[in-house]
């Protein structure tokens, strides 16, 4: 009975009536005490490095790495469009963690200040995380974030902004340094044509051996912490001193990895000299982020540097990019390039067959890959994924260029409301008519969807793009605009064409704000901006037969619906976000096609009214009143239209004339059977 009284009270509750020296409870407490005491300050010196996003032929900016060290996380790389989708595929929790973000390009020459931060705003809006992130980036990126504060002002996730500087190193145009005394040191420089980031964890105390401590008679309680802190303690009986080296293992060596960026082969000499400066501790993991044209024999030779002998190399470059779609659960709705000859990158298929030529200890950086750095080793794990070869066979063609004199061709690029889902990107549509292309809204990821839809025909389509209509300034309708404009500008480098943008007045003010930090001076000079309110009474005449007008919608202030009118092929009406609108019905009467939002199912009508949206049956009523020849329902809430959704009232408007839109749908006016691009 005396022995049982010595057992901790909680052990008695669990029926652990063994003497304390051998009780299950005591042993577990001893083993876990060091781990869970002062959790915010512990350092296990084990680094988990995972790939949040990797480079794909249709991804404009990548990659993004997540480094986990105990209860801290560090995001390194670029947060390009649809980063929020990538975060959703990660099991990691960023809520209660201390997070530092380093947005950095491979070099200053390749800096696309908008591109590396375009996905940040959507993530801030949709994450729901209540935390503060320390964000470190070049000054133009910080300036863009500050000037786009309206995009995330209501987010519970706050940003502590820190600009890179050149004060510490006169040779570096941008440099950064972060020291967290208990955990790690991060430093780097971004030069004109290359960059580096080094990540060093701190040496950690050795592992406390609970079994040895029990055997030597270490008193249960604070004595464990004293031994770990380097102090000697007396045994239980008070007769013997017990020293740290008796119960604490040797210190755990610091872990060390590197990120190297390169945009010019002329930088290899400087990079080699930099590697020569490595001291006695060499990195075990090196991430290489390369611009197009860098990967090849010269760079492979650089990988054989003597101080890389212990390192595992991970290469991110378009030449080795995988064929995975952004929306991996929606493979049937994505058109993937069999040859990957995207106009955006101008790559020949023959240059892509290099994965079999990778040197030893060299791997392609992929989202399925994660690395664990521990005990000066880099261990690689790769989760199973679908076969790119099978996908390439399945998606062997792109949409052809729309023919002239065949009426309207509508390509549905995105159909989701508010946030992208695994099956739907954000609102965006492309209309082709008589050799002219018009885009309706540009949600985040619009240009990637455009690439995916037209592939090798992307550049010819962009050369035909004459106008973009932005219905209103909710971010899910215009955050992809800048990347669309930059792609258009690149496709039209050798001509003097202008592009018309119709939208709310504040849209142009925002673009003007970003002119300097995003380097948009030349692009904005090619834009003719028309305030949407003006086209209510004065349509924009694109050709003698084709015009665009607008109708105020019932949604938020300064929001509009769009009507494209052709003298021969009739009207194509796009509702944008709105409640059923009698003015739109009158303006669009007899439309060849009505593209109408259908955010909520009928049983959520009360919410549709509250949020100024429409239900499916309300959209049918608009089509019936308008006498539209065809109706496409789009802009679906994430909570609606699952396998068991409530169908609308088909007595209002014929089901045979109605289509539920999916990303990748192509509607052609004079085809009896509409074709989905699968």
From Swiss-Prot:
Return one Gene Ontology term, BP aspect: mitochondrial polycistronic RNA processing
Q: State the GO CC annotations.
A: mitochondrion
The EC designation for this entry is: 3.1.26.11
Q: Which Pfam families match?
A: Lactamase_B, Lactamase_B_4
Main location, first listed in the record: mitochondrion
This protein's transit peptide sits at 1-37
Q: What class of enzyme is it?
A: hydrolase
The entry's keywords: Cytoplasm, Endonuclease, Hydrolase, Metal-binding, Mitochondrion, Nuclease, Transit peptide, tRNA processing, Zinc
The family assignment reads: Belongs to the RNase Z family.
PANTHER family per the UniProt record, alphabetical: ZINC PHOSPHODIESTERASE ELAC PROTEIN 2
Task: Outline what the protein does.
Answer: Zinc phosphodiesterase, which displays some tRNA 3'-processing endonuclease activity. May be involved in tRNA maturation, by removing a 3'-trailer from precursor tRNA.
User: This chain belongs to which protein, by name?
Assistant: Ribonuclease Z 2, mitochondrial
């Amino acid at each position: 009975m005396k022995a049982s009284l010595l057992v901790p009270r909680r052990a008695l509750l669990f029926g652990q009536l063994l003497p304390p020296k051998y009780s299950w409870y005591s042993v577990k407490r001893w083993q876990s005490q060091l781990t869970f005491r002062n959790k915010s300050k512990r350092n296990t010196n084990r680094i988990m490095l995972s790939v949040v996003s990797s480079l794909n032929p249709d991804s404009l900016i990548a990659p993004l790495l997540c480094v986990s060290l105990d209860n801290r996380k560090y995001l390194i790389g670029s947060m390009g469009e649809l980063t929020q989708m990538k975060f959703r595929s990660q099991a990691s929790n960023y809520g209660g963690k201390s997070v530092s973000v380093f947005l950095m390009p491979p070099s200053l020459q390749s800096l696309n200040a908008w591109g590396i931060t375009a996905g940040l705003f959507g993530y801030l809006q949709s994450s729901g995380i209540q935390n503060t992130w320390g964000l470190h980036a070049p000054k133009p990126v910080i300036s863009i974030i500050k000037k786009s504060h309206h995009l995330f002002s209501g987010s519970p996730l706050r940003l502590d902004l820190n600009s890179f500087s050149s004060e510490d190193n006169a040779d570096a145009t941008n440099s950064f340094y972060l020291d967290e005394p208990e955990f790690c040191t991060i430093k780097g420089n971004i030069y004109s044509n290359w960059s580096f980031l080094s990540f060093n964890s701190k040496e950690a105390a050795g592992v406390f051996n609970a079994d040895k401590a029990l055997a030597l008679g270490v008193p249960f309680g604070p004595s464990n912490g004293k031994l770990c802190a380097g102090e000697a303690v007396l045994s239980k009986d008070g007769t013997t001193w017990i020293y740290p080296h008796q119960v604490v293992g040797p210190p755990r060596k610091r872990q060390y990895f590197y990120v190297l960026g390169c945009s010019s082969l002329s930088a290899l000499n400087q990079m080699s000299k930099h590697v020569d400066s490595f001291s006695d501790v060499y990195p075990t993991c090196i991430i290489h982020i390369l611009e197009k044209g860098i990967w090849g024999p010269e760079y492979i030779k650089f990988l054989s540097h003597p101080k890389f002998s212990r390192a595992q190399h991970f290469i991110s470059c378009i030449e080795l990019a995988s064929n995975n779609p952004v929306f991996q659960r929606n493979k049937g709705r994505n058109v993937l390039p069999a040859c990957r000859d995207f106009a955006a990158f101008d790559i020949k298929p023959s240059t892509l067959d290099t994965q079999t030529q990778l040197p030893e200890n060299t791997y392609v950086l992929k989202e399925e890959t994660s690395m664990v750095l521990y005990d000066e080793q880099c261990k690689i794990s790769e989760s199973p994924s679908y076969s790119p070869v099978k996908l390439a066979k399945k998606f062997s063609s792109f949409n052809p260029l729309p023919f002239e004199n065949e009426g309207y061709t509508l390509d549905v690029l995105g159909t989701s409301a508010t946030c992208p889902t695994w099956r739907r990107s954000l609102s965006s549509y492309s209309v082709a008519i008589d050799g002219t292309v018009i885009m309706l809204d540009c949600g985040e990821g619009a240009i990637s969807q455009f690439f995916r839809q037209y592939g090798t025909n992307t550049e010819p389509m962009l050369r035909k793009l004459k106008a973009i209509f932005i219905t209103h300034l909710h971010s899910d309708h215009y955050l992809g605009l800048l990347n669309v404009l930059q792609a258009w500008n690149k496709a039209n480098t050798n001509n003097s064409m202008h592009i018309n943008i119709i939208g709310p007045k504040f849209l142009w003010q925002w673009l003007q704000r970003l002119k300097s930090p995003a380097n948009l001076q030349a692009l904005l000079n090619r834009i003719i901006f028309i305030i949407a309110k003006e086209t209510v009474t004065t349509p924009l005449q694109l050709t003698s037969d084709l015009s665009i007008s607008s109708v105020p919608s019932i949604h938020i202030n300064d929001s509009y619906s769009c009507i494209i009118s052709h003298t021969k092929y009739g009207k194509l009406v796009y509702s944008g976000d709105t409640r059923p609108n009698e003015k739109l019905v009158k303006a669009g009467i007899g439309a060849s096609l009505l593209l109408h939002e259908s955010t909520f199912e009928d049983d959520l009508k009360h919410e549709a009214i509250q949020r100024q949206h429409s239900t499916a049956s309300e959209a049918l009523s608009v089509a019936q009143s308008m006498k539209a020849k065809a109706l496409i329902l789009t802009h679906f809430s994430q909570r609606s239209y699952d396998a068991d959704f409530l169908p609308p009232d088909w007595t209002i408007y014929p089901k045979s004339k109605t289509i539920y839109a999916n990303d990748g749908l192509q509607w052609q006016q004079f085809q009896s059977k509409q074709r989905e691009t699968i």
